[in-house]
Regions:
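Surface-exposed, short loops/turns at beta-strand junctions within beta-sandwich domains
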Residues: 49-56
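Short, solvent-exposed loop/turn segments at the edges of extracellular beta-sandwich modules
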Residues: 65-73
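Solvent-exposed serine/threonine-rich low-complexity stretches and specific carbohydrate-binding patches
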Residues: 12-36, 131-142
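Short, solvent-exposed loop/linker segments at the N-terminal edge
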Residues: 102-108
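Conserved aromatic beta-strand anchor motif in extracellular beta-sandwich/beta-rich domains
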Residues: 7-11, 64, 128-130
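Proline-enriched interdomain boundary motifs that mark the N-terminal boundary
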Residues: 89-98
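Aromatic/hydrophobic beta-strand junction motif of beta-rich domains
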Residues: 1, 112-118
Length: 142
């Protein structure tokens, strides 16, 4: 029984790698650039992330599997991380969130960490709405 990993940039598969069960130290790393090849793209090995590696928020996610006789078994839940690619020539503001829970108890304070980048101003104004009702306003210094 071996182990395997799949890594996605947004929803594009960019790594599908199997590790031998005899290797007890399965550490690896991947560098994602606009030249990273998209796998399983109708056998077109020239398709890269160039058209998708753009200014904005993106999701990188990975999933681990056990592999038995070449067949992947059930995998773990995805491990996801939100990233931002910043193109300083773009004038488009960006807002991205950090890790937060999707369910809360009634008595809990809802905490949603976020970052703001607005190349047009030195202090960005952010309004938080719930069901169309303004809850709060914050000013974020760059």
């Amino acid at each position: 029984v071996n182990s395997a990993i799949e890594v996605y940039f947004d929803n594009y598969l960019i790594l599908d790698k199997e590790y031998s069960s005899t290797n007890t130290r399965n550490e690896d790393s991947i560098t994602i650039t606009k030249n990273t090849i998209i796998l399983n793209n109708n056998n077109d090995s020239t398709m890269t992330l160039a058209n998708y590696f753009l200014h904005g928020e993106h999701i990188i996610k990975a999933k681990l599997y056990f592999v038995n006789s070449g067949e992947k078994g059930n995998g773990t839940d995805f491990i996801e991380k939100e990233i931002v690619i910043l193109d300083r020539s773009s004038k488009t503001p960006l807002i991205w969130t950090g890790d937060f829970k999707t369910e809360y108890y009634t008595y809990e304070t809802i905490r949603i960490p976020f970052r703001v980048y607005d190349p047009n101003v030195t202090i960005a104004k952010v309004n938080l709405y719930k069901n169309g009702v303004l809850l709060s306003t914050r000013e974020i210094a760059d």
